[in-house]
Amino acid sequence: MGSFLRSFRNNAGSTTPSVGAVPAKKEVPIPPMTPLEKRLLDMGSIRGDGSDKFYGMENYGNTCYCNSILQCLYYSVPFREAVINYPTRTPIESLEAALAKSLRYPNPNAHLEAEAQAEKQRAANAQRPGMPPAQPQKPEDKDSPDYKKKMALQTLPLLEAQNNATSYGMSESLFTSLKDIFESVVGSQSRIGIVRPQQFLDVLRRDHEMFRTAMHQDAHEFLNLLLNEVVANVEAEASKQPAAIEKSLPAPDHAETVDQSASSGSKTPNTTRWVHELFEGTLTSETQCLTCEKVSQRDEIFLDLSVDLEQHSSVTSCLRKFSAEEMLCERNKFHCDNCGGLQEAEKRMKIKRLPRILALHLKRFKYTEDLQRLQKLFHRVVYPYHLRLFNTTDDAEDPDRLYELYAVVVHIGGGPYHGHYVAIIKTEDRGWLLFDDELVEPVDKNYVRNFFGDKPGLACAYVLFYQETTLEAVMKEQEQENMESNLSATDTNEAALKPNGSSPSHLAHVHSASYIPSLEEHNRPNGLKRAPTAPQLSTHHEHGDPESGAFSPVTATPPVPPIPEHLSAAPIPPKSDVQGKKERAREEKERKAAEKEREKAEKLRRKEQEARAKENQRREEAELKAALEASKASKAQEDRRQSPDHGKDKLGGGLSRLKRGSKSFSQRLGKDKETRSVSSLEAPPLPIPGHPISRDGPIPEQHQQQPDPKDDPFQDSHHPNKPMMKEDEQANHKDPKHERTGHGKWRSFSLRKKSFSILS
């Protein structure tokens, strides 16, 4: 018995340290779930279209510009389906073999082992003799993005896309690298992970030298280059193998996937123009000559639309400024083919064909002359959730197309030569997500409003992605948001009403029954009914916002006494509510159609008024021109009528007077002031018959003075062939110069008055 007890005590003592003293066999704590994993808990089986995959992308130092654009393009459903299905899908066997090589699952405890190894190293260094004590390291902030990215790289599956172009009959290019990334993500069996786009970057740097350096790159420039490169690769491959491309139809094994893509609004590309059909739009440059008023048009193709920014503005105002009239004058005149020369003109830009996916580039970087470099503009520019473009031509296709915001590329930094890019993307059924390289986190819808440019910090929206939608889809989305906000408000109210964490079942039942009608009445006015022009959501909290209209526990309806069972199960009939919503939608549609007709009629009336005003202006100008011509003609006739009387004397006297006036005008100014004053005060006498009097204007001043006989070659004493005048004739000839002077001045005044009366 004693030996048995001793053995029992020994066994008990030996088992005590084995329970908690062996650290090697201690269970490793499971890392907590990330917010993204919590949001994906209720998802069903993995889909075949890749819409339920949420992968980050590894940053290789300065490749955030590439990661943000690739994420935005992947979550564009029609673009993703077009890339995957062109020219054909990769066979399942080849894709699975490639995924077996490229998909790697890291050790989930690698970060714990790395931390333990680092702790051991620090302890060993501290025990060495002569070594200074190590400074205590600051613990890492587990909420920082850098720590979360490091943890994601150590715990999530890593997917490295491989070159698989030969399996679908194409040569390696930037398009095939993009297709390999998309197909790898779609074909993987994990919903979350990290893509390593090393092969894509290698092809990009091989074909384009500007991306080989470690400099900061521009996300908008990369987007434009990528779309043009995809178009070039697809068209080049189609020209090599036209017959193979035409015969590449969907195989029976993935017809279900094609049906899913068609139901989601995307189309399988049967031609090489699928990039043009998605992103391409047409701009029309209208130039009107102000001389002949002829309008000339020139079409331009765009894959993205770049707009200038103004302080405290919106995307709508920026687009209005983009299509504003520009005056072409001075050195920037327009060469009119109709007029045959440079003329002043008015120029405006309008959209003739709208793209299905609208990429709006906000020009945040502007060149300044004083700094001699680009500078970032921190202007506040508001962008809506829903957008309608108004600056379209009269013959535009589908001018009332409605767009919804589905992605925003944000630039974080103080200038164009450094910074960081992230993407905020709206997924199909998981709301808005933040893609920050390796980090993927769910965010609230209002989080998108933080990048207008007026918030503290350096983060501003840089590229906006809008995709086409319908009014019914917008209304359905708003109803879903209202329902979710109401459910969350109900849960909050019920939690607030629970005494000590428990609630009787009958109280919860009565509370929900009495609370439903008030919620339905509260949700009756929606955001679409408030918008007069477009069903766009406001960018600020308003009364109808689900976020701002949610009930709080303070304003919750208090519990009421139990009511009969037949009353508690009587909610508002859903059919009538649905019919009412359909009627409201139909009325809204009819009202918008009527407004559109009125706007067209008003535009036509304004055009007619402008045409009439221009016609009146032209007629008035013609009448004025005719009056001027008539005045000139009458003046010429009068001159011709008066010239035969004294043409010879007038011509000779005029020339002699001009000669004498130009010779001694300054000398004769001081002579005989008395004579000039007396002659100027005398009344103009009548002209002597037979005496030549100038009628074409005032006589020069030298005729008011006695000319020097030596200087005057026309004096009687210097003409030997002319007889001498008598004394009475000389007496009568003494005043004619004054008569000529006064009469000439008077006649000149009368002629001028007459000419002015004709002009008036």
From Swiss-Prot:
A GO biological process this protein is involved in? carbon catabolite repression of transcription
| A GO-annotated cellular component | nucleus
MF (Gene Ontology): cysteine-type deubiquitinase activity
Disulfide bridge map = none
Biased-composition ranges, Basic residues, are 743-760
Q: What keywords would UniProt list here?
A: Coiled coil, Hydrolase, Protease, Thiol protease, Ubl conjugation pathway
Respond yes or no to whether keyword RNA-binding is given for this record.
no
Instruction: Return the protein name.
Output: Probable ubiquitin carboxyl-terminal hydrolase creB
Q: Which organism is it from?
A: Aspergillus clavatus (strain ATCC 1007 / CBS 513.65 / DSM 816 / NCTC 3887 / NRRL 1 / QM 1276 / 107)
Name the encoding gene, please: creB
